[in-house]
């Protein structure tokens, strides 16, 4: 991120604790325990949590929400690419139900600890979300086929596999009341392609503030070097 808002966050201010009952490191996030994987040391947790705080600053290109695009009371959230689950945890009191998709076993352990107080309304799916269904992958459409709830908010942040996720939710995308927070910086053409796709699907959308330089894609980086971070879409 190339903006002054970064200066408001310092990893040295973060206090990392260890839960004696399970050995997992955690930080207090808005009065709730946010657990991290047990392979993270103290400094790694601090760096990670500081990055998460910075990402969700209102001026950040990576911020999922805005003043006009929010999580509402009794929303049903599909958190696609949940990792540590900070987005769901931030809004857990409002949410009617949340589905966390996370394949990594270490992160699943951390998620189970984080959401233990709300386990009656949290479902953890240990698969990648994609455009096919097999032992390791699942599509949004097939997952929802036999579920009693209907999603009202879908957050998609999956390290470049966003297009596959969209391809696997052709039925879900037609829901009349749906909000989507969709990352667009992982691949060079994502913003242009996804904004067009969502427009064709009947969504109104806005881009997040500013731009990002995605350092993980330096080998294939082409002009324009700076990318829009996120699309917020709703019907």
Write out the residue ranges for each language-model feature:
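A short acidic, amphipathic alpha-helical/loop segment
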Residues: 90, 94, 113-114, 165-172, ...
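S-adenosyl-L-methionine
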Residues: 1-94, 99-148, 192, ...
């Amino acid at each position: 991120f190339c903006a002054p808002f970064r200066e408001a966050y310092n990893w040295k201010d973060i206090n990392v604790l260890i839960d004696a009952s399970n050995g997992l490191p955690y930080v207090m996030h808005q009065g709730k325990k946010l657990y991290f994987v047990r392979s993270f040391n103290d400094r790694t947790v601090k760096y990670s949590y500081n990055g998460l705080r910075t990402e969700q600053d209102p001026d950040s290109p990576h911020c999922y929400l805005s003043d006009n695009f929010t999580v509402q009371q009794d929303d049903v959230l599909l958190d696609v690419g949940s990792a540590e689950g900070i987005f769901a945890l931030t809004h857990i009191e409002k949410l009617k139900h949340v589905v966390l998709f996370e394949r990594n076993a270490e992160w699943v352990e951390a998620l189970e600890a984080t959401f233990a107080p709300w386990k009656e309304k949290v479902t953890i799916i240990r698969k990648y979300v994609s455009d096919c269904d097999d032992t390791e992958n699942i599509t949004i459409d097939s997952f929802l086929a036999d579920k009693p709830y209907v999603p009202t908010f879908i957050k998609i942040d999956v390290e470049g596999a966003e297009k596959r996720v969209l391809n696997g939710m052709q039925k879900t995308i037609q829901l009349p009341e749906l909000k989507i927070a969709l990352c667009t910086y992982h691949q060079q053409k994502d913003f242009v392609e996804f904004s067009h796709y969502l427009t064709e699907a009947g969504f109104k959308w806005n881009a997040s503030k500013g731009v990002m330089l995605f350092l993980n894609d330096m080998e294939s980086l082409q002009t324009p070097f700076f990318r829009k971070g996120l699309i917020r879409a709703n019907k």
